[in-house]
Amino acid sequence: SQEIRPLIESTLKSLSQVERTRVPELRYLSLESLKDQSSLKDIDYLIASASVFAALEKYSGLKAVASVKPAVSFSADHASSTAILVDKQNLSVKTLKDLKGKTIGLPAQSSPEERVQVLNEFKMQGFKESDFATFKRISGEYGKWLKDLKNGSIDALALDPLAFRKLPESIRMRMNLLEPRIKDDYILGHTTATYPGWVMAATLKAGKKETVYLEAFLKSLRPVEGLSWAPQADYRQTHQVLTSLDDPFYKSFKKRTWREIVEENLVWWALAGVVLFSWLLHTLFTNRLVNMRTRQLFEANERRL
């Protein structure tokens, strides 16, 4: 997501100024690569959207360190939502119900959250058909969005409210926000319910003391373009939503079998076996020496008597 990039860049810059032993490195991972759990073996921390984190929390043991909180939200539990927008001149779409059979545009480089949040909004309002509306990836350039709405390639646009606020006023004034919610824990106009947002998570490779230090450090940083780090949100709702929607990415993860765990950590298992075998040999050898010395002392005492 473009909205979180300035916060990430500022955070890395601040970390590099205080971290003397190693330089923080930013590496981008695709959603597909995350399905292979070995993709995280060299990663200490992962910055991910809520739905991606939820999948990895359940199946890869990630632990939330700190969550992103926009200044417009009451808490990190209400840090993300989606605005559904239509062309003002399109009088055929005035409510979410009117989107039945329509196409919703998802800008390139947007997070997976917009699609998940829109689908859950449909479900909460009783529109449970799996094909109630379709989604289409469109250009990430806002100049092309109105053209897409005009020519009918899309009927509506799903957008992060923070991104909508940054659009030129001339663009915003030509769009209508469907069924806006403006009196809740997220004060920007939006259509869907609110959810936890982006999160910094620790992998199994990260040390416990280091993670505690990082959490305190992140929360001490100043906001960047209206975004800051806050205590970790409650992502249980995200798990419930993804399970309820039978989300393809979420359900694509599976728990590892014992065989996979052994194969993944074969070197460590072998090392543990060597250590255990050496300990057994040492114990047997030591016991034998003790028994032999005890017998020698006993025989010597008998001869003296």
Q: Each predicted region: which residue ranges?
A:
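Short, aromatic-rich amphipathic segments at membrane interfaces
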Residues: 239-266
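A ligand-binding cleft/hinge motif common to bilobed small-molecule-binding domains
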Residues: 47-61, 121-124, 150, 155-184
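Alpha-helical transmembrane signal-anchor helices
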Residues: 258-294
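Extracytoplasmic small-molecule ligand-binding "clamshell" domains
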Residues: 1-61
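Short helix-initiation/N-cap motifs at beta->coil->alpha
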Residues: 25-37, 69, 129-147, 151
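Bilobed "Venus flytrap"/periplasmic-binding protein-like clamshell domains
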Residues: 1-17, 77-146, 162
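Short beta-strand->loop
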Residues: 62-77, 131-134, 169-194
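Extended ligand-binding regions for polar small-molecule ligands
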Residues: 9-18, 89-90, 174-249
